[in-house]
Amino acid sequence: MNIILYSKDGCPNCVTAKKLLESKGLTYQEFDVGTPDGVVIFQANVSAQHRQLPQIFINNQRVGGLAGLQAALKQIEGS
Protein backbone atom coordinates (compact mmCIF):
# COMPACT_ATOMS: atom_id res chain seq x y z
CA MET A 1 0.00 0.00 0.00
CA ASN A 2 1.38 3.40 -0.99
CA ILE A 3 0.43 6.13 1.52
CA ILE A 4 1.35 9.79 1.13
CA LEU A 5 0.66 12.26 3.93
CA TYR A 6 0.94 16.03 3.59
CA SER A 7 1.35 17.61 7.01
CA LYS A 8 2.68 20.62 8.89
CA ASP A 9 4.14 21.23 12.34
CA GLY A 10 1.53 22.39 14.84
CA CYS A 11 -1.29 20.46 13.15
CA PRO A 12 -2.97 18.23 15.76
CA ASN A 13 -4.85 16.16 13.17
CA CYS A 14 -1.57 15.55 11.33
CA VAL A 15 -0.04 14.14 14.52
CA THR A 16 -3.09 11.94 15.10
CA ALA A 17 -3.02 10.66 11.50
CA LYS A 18 0.66 9.73 11.80
CA LYS A 19 0.06 7.95 15.11
CA LEU A 20 -2.87 6.05 13.60
CA LEU A 21 -0.80 4.88 10.63
CA GLU A 22 2.08 3.89 12.90
CA SER A 23 -0.25 2.00 15.26
CA LYS A 24 -1.41 -0.07 12.29
CA GLY A 25 2.19 -0.75 11.26
CA LEU A 26 1.72 1.15 8.01
CA THR A 27 4.58 3.03 6.40
CA TYR A 28 3.96 6.32 4.67
CA GLN A 29 5.79 9.05 2.83
CA GLU A 30 5.39 12.44 4.48
CA PHE A 31 5.73 15.87 2.92
CA ASP A 32 5.99 18.80 5.33
CA VAL A 33 4.17 21.76 3.79
CA GLY A 34 5.92 23.99 6.30
CA THR A 35 9.03 23.77 4.10
CA PRO A 36 9.51 25.39 0.68
CA ASP A 37 10.00 22.00 -1.03
CA GLY A 38 6.95 20.58 0.72
CA VAL A 39 4.80 23.50 -0.44
CA VAL A 40 5.86 23.00 -4.06
CA ILE A 41 5.08 19.27 -3.93
CA PHE A 42 1.76 19.90 -2.17
CA GLN A 43 0.65 22.52 -4.70
CA ALA A 44 1.66 20.29 -7.61
CA ASN A 45 -0.21 17.23 -6.34
CA VAL A 46 -3.21 18.45 -4.34
CA SER A 47 -6.14 20.35 -5.84
CA ALA A 48 -6.47 23.99 -4.76
CA GLN A 49 -9.87 23.18 -3.22
CA HIS A 50 -8.23 20.74 -0.75
CA ARG A 51 -5.93 22.90 1.32
CA GLN A 52 -6.77 21.71 4.84
CA LEU A 53 -4.24 19.46 6.56
CA PRO A 54 -3.54 16.66 6.71
CA GLN A 55 -4.18 15.54 3.16
CA ILE A 56 -3.76 11.81 2.70
CA PHE A 57 -3.55 9.66 -0.40
CA ILE A 58 -3.69 5.87 -0.47
CA ASN A 59 -2.60 4.21 -3.72
CA ASN A 60 -2.88 7.57 -5.52
CA GLN A 61 -6.49 8.08 -4.35
CA ARG A 62 -7.21 11.07 -2.13
CA VAL A 63 -8.93 9.95 1.07
CA GLY A 64 -8.94 13.45 2.56
CA GLY A 65 -8.00 14.30 6.12
CA LEU A 66 -8.07 12.42 9.39
CA ALA A 67 -11.73 11.35 9.14
CA GLY A 68 -11.16 10.15 5.57
CA LEU A 69 -8.13 8.15 6.69
CA GLN A 70 -10.09 6.53 9.50
CA ALA A 71 -12.90 5.57 7.10
CA ALA A 72 -10.47 4.24 4.47
CA LEU A 73 -8.62 2.10 7.01
CA LYS A 74 -11.89 0.64 8.31
CA GLN A 75 -12.89 -0.22 4.75
CA ILE A 76 -9.50 -1.81 4.02
CA GLU A 77 -9.59 -3.82 7.25
CA GLY A 78 -13.13 -4.99 6.49
CA SER A 79 -12.30 -6.30 3.03
List the predicted regions and their residue ranges:
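Local sequence-structure signature of Cys/Sec-based thiol-disulfide redox active-site neighborhoods
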Residues: 1-29
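Structural micro-motif
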Residues: 46-56, 66-67
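Non-catalytic, surface beta->alpha helical segment in thiol-disulfide oxidoreductase systems
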Residues: 58-79
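Short alpha-helical
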Residues: 12, 37, 64
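Generic recognition of short, well-ordered alpha-helical segments
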Residues: 15-19, 41, 67-68
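Thioredoxin-like thiol-disulfide oxidoreductase module
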Residues: 32-51
